């Protein structure tokens, strides 16, 4: 479990959000490793000995640029966004792709199993809902805390199958900026091992009605060693598309 240091300046909204996740309140930072810090109106991830931090902010920086200037063209094609599909993001992480998909007008159900990451993402969505420029997009994201491979079958029984299941398993960010590399290093250290790829892909193909879209590095290996039906390839990233079991590629 992850420690969280709650500063006296933390708002009641932040304190309420924190209680939704199994975190360990502490009175001072740990001697080593990572921890969450709740202060003012934000929850951030800190690494002992480092000045920088990680927060989920959909209202500025890279998220704002992608929202106002584009940048989601390839993922839009991969999910066939013009058909207005419902999307379940089974590996939400810090929510960047969920937000891009929601900014395309799609309804996104996001799953995140790590309590600290889910807390960071939930906080980012909460603040985005308060911003007039992002509130409509944020309102289209429904976050579920838990293991997607375990939760999706149960959710299908109550909501039916989604059109798309989206997967973005963790992989090294070799060509990203130094700031992004440091952020991902924090993230990987916090999360540790990723979900079982075989089980995740299998469950996704059982769940989706139309397709499973997997984000990979352009030259990366196929997820779980399984070749996709087809691909959308960009300069540094590609999207592998798998069909649901029993579906006809044609």
Swiss-Prot record:
<keyword id="KW-0963">Cytoplasm</keyword>
<dbReference type="InterPro" id="IPR029063">
    <property type="entry name" value="SAM-dependent_MTases_sf"/>
</dbReference>
<keyword id="KW-0949">S-adenosyl-L-methionine</keyword>
<feature type="binding site">
    <location>
        <position position="168"/>
    </location>
    <ligand>
        <name>S-adenosyl-L-methionine</name>
    </ligand>
</feature>
<dbReference type="InterPro" id="IPR007536">
    <property type="entry name" value="16SrRNA_methylTrfase_J"/>
</dbReference>
<keyword id="KW-0808">Transferase</keyword>
<protein>
    <recommendedName>
        <fullName>Ribosomal RNA small subunit methyltransferase J</fullName>
        <ecNumber>2.1.1.242</ecNumber>
    </recommendedName>
</protein>
<keyword id="KW-0698">rRNA processing</keyword>
<dbReference type="Pfam" id="PF04445">
    <property type="entry name" value="SAM_MT"/>
</dbReference>
<dbReference type="GO" id="GO:0005737">
    <property type="term" value="C:cytoplasm"/>
</dbReference>
<comment type="function">
    <text>Specifically methylates the guanosine in position 1516 of 16S rRNA.</text>
</comment>
<comment type="similarity">
    <text>Belongs to the methyltransferase superfamily. RsmJ family.</text>
</comment>
<dbReference type="GO" id="GO:0008990">
    <property type="term" value="F:rRNA (guanine-N2-)-methyltransferase activity"/>
</dbReference>
<feature type="binding site">
    <location>
        <begin position="96"/>
        <end position="97"/>
    </location>
    <ligand>
        <name>S-adenosyl-L-methionine</name>
    </ligand>
</feature>
<keyword id="KW-0489">Methyltransferase</keyword>
